[in-house]
């Protein structure tokens, strides 16, 4: 996991949230230790595996955010996982996503396109894949949050490595993809006429 890529996301968003994942079972009423810690910029959420326990002060130190820069970054720390997403490694509703061999840029955002098993399109900003660049193999799955909104679960083997809410598909994206589709059809017809 590339922490520098996560730092860049958080600084661009002006927001970082540390999230503590409590243990599965408490031990004899003692204050339970944190099982896993996560970090989010509000769109992507990544585990902080292999690092010591972080708090607001330590994440600012790691991200080189001094007192002068602190007003440009909202830092929060939640003692529990947010209720909408599923943070488990394996989820029975996981829908494998096929990454389309097609990337595009729209309004300055580089986009990755995925298709779910029903043929529906999911799009994420490419910058949210950067933390996974050190791994050769990652698989993506569609999950639904408690409100029925889709999000992408990124797995490395059987281990959850990130959760990403998709890019909103608006008119501009639909029109751009439609124009690409139409232009490709015209080009294919012209190629056929040459034969």
Please place each PLM-identified region on the residue numbering.
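Intrinsically disordered, low-complexity linker/loop segments enriched in Gly/Pro
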Residues: 1-33, 38-42, 46-48
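C-terminal functional regions that serve as terminal interaction/effector modules
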Residues: 41-44, 49-50, 57-195
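Glycine-centered loop/turn motifs
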Residues: 20, 54-57
